[in-house]
Swiss-Prot record:
Cofactor(s) recorded in Swiss-Prot or TrEMBL: [4Fe-4S] cluster
EC number: 2.8.4.3
Matching InterPro entries: Elp3/MiaA/NifB-like_rSAM (IPR006638), Methylthiotransferase (IPR005839), Methylthiotransferase_CS (IPR020612), Methylthiotransferase_N (IPR013848), Methylthiotransferase_N_sf (IPR038135), MiaB_methiolase (IPR006463), rSAM (IPR007197), rSAM_horseshoe (IPR023404)
Annotated ranges, domain TRAM: 387-451
Keywords, sorted A to Z: 4Fe-4S, Cytoplasm, Iron, Iron-sulfur, Metal-binding, S-adenosyl-L-methionine, Transferase, tRNA processing
Protein known as: tRNA-2-methylthio-N(6)-dimethylallyladenosine synthase
Taxonomic superkingdom: Bacteria
Compartment(s) of residence: Cytoplasm
Cofactor binding remark: Binds 2 [4Fe-4S] clusters. One cluster is coordinated with 3 cysteines and an exchangeable S-adenosyl-L-methionine.
Any one of the GO CC terms: cytosol
């Protein structure tokens, strides 16, 4: 029996797909090379932007034709499955199972049922659409392991959901309120990942800074304390060398967290801190609950405490009511802070959010033009920052051979820059760390020589 994943959206979706893959492998399934020939197609969906949903709808249309030609099962999961639970199966009858965000604990049984149905056309299905919907909601299920086989990197979900309710964001409505994973479960996963040869982990949550989980003795552990505990667990084998985390909310970027990042050698000196906009007026309408002054204060504290820190952010343009002065404020902020990189996008109205009913929507062509200015500026800043790193000696996690030249190796730096090691480096470096000098920059990829 074969499976194939199509995963859309955020890193949490990728982690959840990896955790489901672990279950399938343990049950004897094998990974198919493509979606066209699998027995089970699992589509893990995203609802953050309408473009992500449209891509899924397009793929469902494609697979509708394929399903008329051969037998296979389609399982829809993720945020879109939660948001459009009933409607989407009515529109696309090819979907055999829709599993919402809070029914994921049923997946092991559903996988067994699909295997039985593949073997026997007369098998009576238990987990019909109505039955799944009527099952008691268990709350969010944290899988014990989210590691993709043979990978030197792994995501580790530590919390799910969001309590912030930014007016443009659908996430709290599809993922629910914040739930923190128990400390001991997280540390057990760290131990298992170390035994599997994982060298780098990324802690995940919609707002990791607000983590508040209990340890084995019932004590409440906040995010800085959790990071310290994870670092001490990693010390035991020295296998996991780099620890990352995302996403963070500026209101929760505490001095204690900044000091912990500075103090712990395993914590990567890279912080992703979404600002979303440079105008206080727009931030207030977004319900971001901080001001630009507060944000700049946090950035100043980060730079003063960790001089070599790299900073990335999210920027959302074209929010309802946005003026040219608001756009200028955003461009000014970018020039002042000089983010190393940014994820930039324009506003998509999401039905069910507060901003969906806001007046003064910005015309599509204006949103695109404003976003273009932001992207152009960030590209210049990123190029400047990357050129300044030429000649520096850095550590690189070597992941694989280079796609273009097998005699070269590919990896990334502590601050996430893609790097090719040239000069016939030994293949034994794959899965290990190499110390190298950044010699050239081609596009957004460094070329480096071993020291």
């Amino acid at each position: 029996m074969t499976y194939f994943f199509e995963t859309y959206g955020c890193q949490m979706n990728q982690a959840e797909s990896s955790s489901m893959e672990q279950i399938l492998l343990e049950k004897g399934w094998t990974n198919s090379s493509d979606a066209e020939h699998c027995d089970l197609l699992i589509i893990n969906t995203c609802s953050v932007r309408i473009t992500a949903e449209n891509r899924v709808l397009g793929r469902l249309g494609h697979f509708s034709g394929l399903k008329k030609k051969r037998k296979f099962f389609v399982l829809l999961i993720g945020c879109m499955a939660e948001r459009l639970y009933t409607e989407i199966q009515k529109e696309f009858p090819l979907i055999d199972y829709v599993v919402g965000m809070f029914e994921r604990n049923l997946l092991p049984q559903i996988f067994d049922e699909i295997k039985a149905r593949l073997k026997n056309d007369n098998y009576m299905a238990e987990f019909t659409h109505d039955n799944i919907e009527e099952k008691p909601v268990s709350g969010y299920y944290f899988a014990p392991l989210s590691h993709s086989p043979k990978s030197f990197q792994s995501y580790v979900p530590i919390m799910n959901g969001c309590n912030n309710f930014c007016t443009y964001c659908i996430v709290p409505y599809v993922r629910g309120r914040e739930v923190s994973r128990p400390v001991n479960e997280i540390l057990q996963e760290i131990t298992e990942l170390s035994s599997r040869g994982v060298r780098e982990i990324t802690l995940l949550g919609q707002n990791v800074n607000s983590y508040k989980g209990e340890d084995g003795e019932g004590r409440l552990i906040d995010f800085p304390k959790l990071l310290t505990l994870i670092a001490r667990e990693a010390d035991k084998t020295d296998m996991i060398r780099w620890i990352r985390f995302m996403s963070s909310h500026p209101k929760d970027m505490s001095d204690a967290l900044i000091d912990t990042i500075a103090a712990e050698k395993r914590l990567c000196k890279l912080v992703h801190l979404p600002v979303q906009h440079g105008s206080d007026t727009i931030l207030k309408r977004m319900n971001r609950v901080y001001t630009i002054e507060h944000y700049k204060n946090r950035i100043k504290r980060l730079k003063e405490t960790i001089p070599d820190i790299a900073l990335s952010t999210d920027i959302l343009m074209g929010f309802p009511g946005e003026t040219e002065d608001d756009v200028k404020a955003t461009l000014d902020l970018m020039q002042e802070i000089e983010f190393d990189s940014a994820f930039m996008y324009h506003y998509n109205p999401r039905e069910g959010t507060k901003a969906f009913n806001y007046p003064d929507r910005i015309p599509e062509e204006v949103k695109i033009e404003r976003l273009g200015r932001v992207i152009d500026l960030q590209l210049k800043i990123t190029a400047k920052k990357m050129k300044a790193k030429l000649g520096k000696k850095v550590d690189i996690l070597v992941e694989s051979h280079s796609r273009n030249e097998r005699s070269e190796l590919f990896g990334h730096t502590e601050q996430g820059e893609m790097t090719v090691i040239q000069g016939n480096p030994p293949e034994s470096l794959i899965g290990n760390f190499a110390h190298a000098e950044l010699k050239e920059l081609k596009g957004k990829t460094f070329r480096a020589n071993l020291n």
